[in-house]
Amino acid sequence: MNFPIFALFSFISGSIPFGYWIALRFAGVDIRKLGSKNIGATNVGRLIGWKFGFVVLALDITKGMLPVYLSSVYVPEGGIPFQLLCGVCAVLGHMFSPFLGFRGGKGVATTFGVFLVLTPIACLGAVLVFWVVYKFFKFVSLGSIFASITLPLVYAFSTILLLHEEVSYWVLGTMVFISFGIILTHRENIIRILNRSELFAVKGEEQDGDSERNRR
C-alpha cells in the first residue's frame, strides 16, 4: 500500500463518527443537537449513559492508534514522519468527518490514541494533568485544553529526563500543531467557561464544584 492510499485510509478511519452513530442507534437522538452538541464521549455519556460514553471513548482512541500502528507495520520505510502524518490525518478526519458534512468532534481522544502508540509516557503525564484540572474545575473541556497544551512539554521533559533520549522534533512539532488545533475546536467551550455557562460532565456536579471552589 503506497503512501497516499494509506494516508487516505487514516483520514477515513478517523472520520468514522462513532459517537453520532451510537447515540442515533441506541437512543434515537442526534447528538449534534443536544447538550454540548459535540459527538464525543463526554456528550454521549452525559446524555444517553456513561456505558455508551466509555464505548465511544475507546473507539475514538482506537481511531488514533490504529493508523499509526498499521503504518509502522505495512509502511515501515515511512518511519516516524509518516506515522505522524497518518496520525494527523486520523485526527483531522475526526474533526472534519465527511460522514457529517465535514464537521466533527474535538479530536482529543483520537489525539491521545495517536501518541499513546508513539509516546506513552507523555500521554500518561497528559492524562494526569487532565485529571487534576477536571477534579478541581469539573470541566472535561478545560481538562482537555490543559492536557493538550502540556503534552508537548511533558513529552520533552520525559524524553530528556526519564528516557535519556533526544527529543524528536517531528513528534514535538506535530504535538504543537495538533494541540493548537484542539484549542481551536474548543473555542466555544472557552467562551462558555468564561461566561459560566459551560456544561459539567456529570449532572449535579455544578453545585458540588462551586461549593468546593468556594471552600478553597
Swiss-Prot record:
Pfam assignment, any one: G3P_acyltransf
One cellular component term from this protein's GO annotations in UniProt: plasma membrane
Keyword check for 4Fe-4S: no
Localisation per UniProt entry: Cell inner membrane
EC class: transferase
SMART domains for the chain: G3P_acyltransf
Keywords: Cell inner membrane, Cell membrane, Lipid biosynthesis, Lipid metabolism, Membrane, Phospholipid biosynthesis, Phospholipid metabolism, Transferase, Transmembrane, Transmembrane helix
Family matches, as InterPro entries: G3P_acylTferase_PlsY
Protein origin, superkingdom: Bacteria
Pathway recorded for this protein: Lipid metabolism; phospholipid metabolism
Gene Ontology molecular functions: acyl-phosphate glycerol-3-phosphate acyltransferase activity
Membrane topology listed for this record: Multi-pass membrane protein
Catalysis: reaction(s): an acyl phosphate + sn-glycerol 3-phosphate = a 1-acyl-sn-glycero-3-phosphate + phosphate
A biological process term (GO) from this entry: phospholipid biosynthetic process
E.C. designation(s): 2.3.1.275
TM annotation in the entry: 3-23, 48-68, 82-102, 112-132, 142-162, 166-186
Family according to the record: Belongs to the PlsY family.
Known partners and oligomeric status: Probably interacts with PlsX.
Listed PANTHER family: GLYCEROL-3-PHOSPHATE ACYLTRANSFERASE-RELATED, INNER MEMBRANE PROTEIN YGIH
Role summary: Catalyzes the transfer of an acyl group from acyl-phosphate (acyl-PO(4)) to glycerol-3-phosphate (G3P) to form lysophosphatidic acid (LPA). This enzyme utilizes acyl-phosphate as fatty acyl donor, but not acyl-CoA or acyl-ACP.
Name of this chain's protein: Glycerol-3-phosphate acyltransferase
Organism: Leptospira interrogans serogroup Icterohaemorrhagiae serovar copenhageni (strain Fiocruz L1-130)
